[in-house]
Amino acid sequence: MKHFTTILIIAAVAFTFTACKKDIDPVFPPATDAEIQLNGIAAAEPGSAAGNSVYLDLSGAKQKTVLRSGWDIGFYCGADFRVILNSTSVAGAKVLAANDITAVGAADTIGLVLNTSQTNPLPEQMIFFDDISGDITKTVIPAVSAVDADNKVIIINRGNGGGIAARPWIKIRILRNGSNAYTLQYARITETTFKTLQIAKDAVNHFRQVSFDDGIVDNQPEKDKWDIGWTYTLYQANFGAGLVPYNFSDMIVVNHLSGVTVAQKIYADAATALAAYNAFNADSAAATTLVSGKWTIAGSWRSTQPATGARLDRFYVIKDAS
């Protein structure tokens, strides 16, 4: 059964939405409106550096809140063997030529930044980070090979984006463990011994997430239990000299790996948009063209110039893949 949701964003961390179900039966049940106040603040930090990411299940009007600093890398549960960095902490990485983790130390970090600057971001810094669009084939960490010798040591800056305290750099090496699991070797960059962790793929998650402090953690809902998320994250910008990595707050991420799709409906002014939102129904949904992509909403819902706030001339139609 498909679920369509229309969303009118009314404040930085509040959403109003109407859900309607599309079924084989042409009779649609009445839609219900709901408003969710997002729990983005982890402690006393400003909203522009909210410590939490918030994941929303729109059809269930549920949210899951997780600390952005609560995980470091994610192990893909799909057919390929891929590992992602935590873009919400702005983690960066570099792959070395070595495959002996004990032989890598602080000297290997000389000259490395593995980060970006809000005041002077550079195009050449893009290589430190995973593909912004979320293409799982374009991660900094290469696909994990079935041949152990091909899997090199990787240095990771865990990231300090959005007020996260700087933490020691980490060195890792990842191997395949049979046909459905990974072996992670990891240590602080100055350590000469390493820890080992086994991570099994499963059928209910897109990624199994790992914290270098706490091991395997539950820092994202199961793949079919969220539609969109709200977070501070690494993204990209163009200030005239090409794309550069740039950190943004209040970004909306779409669960594109689960097939969630989106349409943005823009109108002449706020009053027209509100009237269209109130009139939107199942027939409107059926006639709407939706698109896929991790950042189909991104920051388009809000304005920073000349005034900061939600853009009231638009709303969004979201369809899950269930």
What is each PLM-predicted segment?
Residues 21-322:
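Surface-exposed, beta-sheet-biased, low-hydrophobicity segments with strongly acidic/polar composition
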Residues 2-10:
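Sec-dependent signal peptide recognition
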Residues 15-19:
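C-terminal motif of bacterial Sec signal peptides marking the signal peptidase cleavage site
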